[in-house]
Amino acid sequence: MKRMSQAFNNCLTHIKKEEELYMYQKKRNSLITMILTLTLVMGCLTGCGGGGSKGDGQSADAGGSDKKPVTLEIIRWGGGLPAQDDDIIKAEILKRLNVNIELVGYDDISDYINTVNTRIATGDYPDMFWVNQELLRNYSKKGLVMDLTDVYQNELSTVKDWLGDSLDMGVVDGKTYGIPVPISFEYCMSFIREDWLNHLGLSIPTNLDELYDVAVAFTNDDPDGNGKNDTFALTGNNGLRAFSAIFGAYGVALPTNSGALPSIYVKDGNLVSTVTDPDIKDAILEAKKFVDAGVIDPELFGNTGSQPVQDKAFQGKVGMTRIEWSLFAKDIHIEQAKAVNPDASWKPMGTIGGGNGKELDGEWQIGTPVHMFAIPATLSQSPEKKEALFKVLNYLSTEEGNRLVAYGPEGTYHQVNADGEVELINNDLWKKSDLQAYLYNYQFTGRGDESKYLIIRNPMSRDVIEFAAAQPRIKCLNGFVDFPEGFVASDAATFAEEELIKFIYGRRPIEEYDEFVKTLKEVYSYQSYLDAAGETLQSMGYIK
C-alpha cells in the first residue's frame, strides 16, 4: 500500500507539471484537461506503480526494452562467420530477444578441441560450447557441465518438445547433459554416371553381379569415348565407405567415417558389430573381387575430404562414387559439374541386392548428433546469463525462431506464403550472400523438418534429397553407448580399420579373420565395449 501511495504521489507531481506546461502553451478547456489528467493518472498507476501487465511476450523480450542486453559468449567448431558488426543473425536475435550473442567459430576441429580443453582447465568458461559425445562424456563425469535432466522438464520445455527423442543423444550415465543437433536421415549415398551407362548400353545396377559388370566396363571399355584407358569405376571419401553398397548387400554396416569404431546394430534380433556380423566374411570376399579386378580408385585412401572426390568425378576420372549428397549434389555442385562437362549426368544409385537379401544402403548412426552443445555448470552462478541463454534456446526451438536461423530474416531472405510454406524471396541473393555459409552456426537446436529445409535451400537437388531420405539404412547405435573404463576407442578403431583394409585388399588371408576379432576383443578391450553396448541398448529397449 505504501508503494502504491508513493507511486500515486509521484504521478500527481508529474500531472501538475504537465498542467502548468499546457497552460503556458495554450489554454485548454476544462474537459480536455480532465481527460488528460485521468489518462495520466491511469497511466502512472499502471506503468509507474509496477503492478500491471507487461503486455505480450514478444515486446517484453524485444530489444526495444530499456534494459541493457545480456551478452553471451558461445564457441563452437564451425566456420564462415562474418565480422560481428556484419552478422545479421546476431543483430536479429539482439533485436528480438535483447540478447547479444558473441559467437566464435573454429574451422579446424583439433584447434577447437585444444582451445575448449584449455579454457575449461583454466576456469575460463564460455556460456555455451560445442561438444562431441566423447567431450560430453569426459566433462559430465567431472561435473563440469550442467545437468539438464530436470531443466528440460521446466525452463527448457520448449526445446524438449522440439527435439523429442533426439535428447537421448545427449545422455551420459542416465542423465541428460547435451543439447543435440539431430539429423533426420543419412546423407551418404552412391552416385553413378548415367551418360556412361547409356554410352555402354548398360543400366543402373541393382545387384552385385550387375554392379561388378558395370564396374569392369567403366574401367576397361572407354565409357567416356575419348579413346584412352584413363577411368576407374569406384571412389569415395573417408576410405572404407566406398564399399558400403557392396557390404550393404549383405546387411553389413561399414563405419561412415574413417577412424570410427566398428558400427553397432541389431541384426535378426541380435546385437552385432561390423566385425562380429555373421555375414562379414562373405562381404569382405565380395569386395576383394572388385579390388582384384582393378576397378577401385588406386588413390582411394588418400581421398582426404570431399575435394579429391569432386575433382575426380567432375573431371570424368570415375563413374561411381560414395559421398554425402550435400558435398556432391547441391545446386552449387550441379553447376560446377555442368561447367566442366555439360553432358555429364550423375544419378543416385539405390541399394544393391544379391548378397543375403538384406539390401541396405550403408549405416545411419541414429544415436549420434551432427552437432551438440553443452552448458558449463558454472553458469548456474549467473542467473541473468542462464535466463538469457534459455530464452535463446527456447526461441530457436519455435517455428518463428527456427526460420530465422534456417533461412535468414523474414521479408528479406524468405517469406511465408498463404499456405504457411516457406519460400526464398530471392535465390540470387542467397548465392551472393555469405549468409548461407554461416547460418548453420546458429542452429543450436537443429532445423526441424530436415527434408523440407534442404529442399527449400537447394531446389535443384529435390530429387536427390528425397532419394537419400527414402533409402533403407542400417540403423546403428554407437552414439548411445558410453565407453567403459580402460577402453581406448581410438586405438581399437584404428586397429579394426587397418585390419579390415588388409582383408579386403588381400594383404591378410580371410582364414585369419577370427584371430583378428579375438585380438580386437582381448588386446584392445573391444569385448568390454560390446558388453557395455549390450547392457545400455537392452535398457533402452533396442534388444531383449
Residue ranges and their predicted role:
Residues 10-12, 16, 20, 24-25, ...:
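Extracytoplasmic/secretory soluble proteins
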Residues 7:
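Basic Arg/Gly/Lys-rich low-complexity intrinsically disordered segments
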